[in-house]
Amino acid sequence: CGAGAEWLRDKCALCLNCLRVCPYDVPVITEAGRIDIRVDQCQGCGICFPACPCKAIGFGMLGVTEIQSRLKDAIDEAKGRNGGPTIAVIYCDFDAYDITNLRRMMKGKHPGKLLVGIPCLAKLSAIDLLRAFEYGVDGVLAIGCPNNECTYQEGEYWGQRRVDEAKRLLAELEMADRLEMHYISGLDLDQFD
């Protein structure tokens, strides 16, 4: 489908992070001592993507630039919408939520909340979460799939881990309370209020 990971040989430092984090055992070490990402077996979860310090993994579905662009565009659109705080609501848009219901529920009620859909929160890095603050939001709410509802193995684990990493960094600035992670099933959107 072209949505999975692609190894960018010229950027790879052979750190083996992709091997460590992939729940599907897609990356392997070849006899020549190189990494091989078996594209035909990749599930497209994106867990390896933010784990690569050299950006040596290309991603067909949604890459770093696209994630940051979605975030920046949504924040720019929301600026000036109201005088109150702006909260970026980053949610899994892969299949956990009915976006129509989420938008309808928020319409008029929460003018300072902006929706940014990402196909699985595991694709986010701590830097992506921190960049939202750099772009001017007052807070970030990450909404992920509840345990065992994620389309991908370990998706909720890696999403939570990256939120925790960003919160640790924000704590040094006394801003940890501005980033929250919640798990809400598509059936439980009334919890969002």
Descriptions of predicted regions:
Residues 7:
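Catalytic cores of glycan-processing enzymes that make or break glycosidic bonds
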Residues 1-3, 29, 107-113:
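Gly-rich Lys/Arg/Thr-decorated short loops/hinges at beta-loop-alpha junctions or inter-strand turns
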Residues 1, 17-43, 47-66, 70:
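Iron-sulfur cluster-binding cysteine motifs and their immediate structural context
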Residues 49, 60-193:
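Iron-sulfur-associated redox domains of electron-transfer enzymes in respiratory
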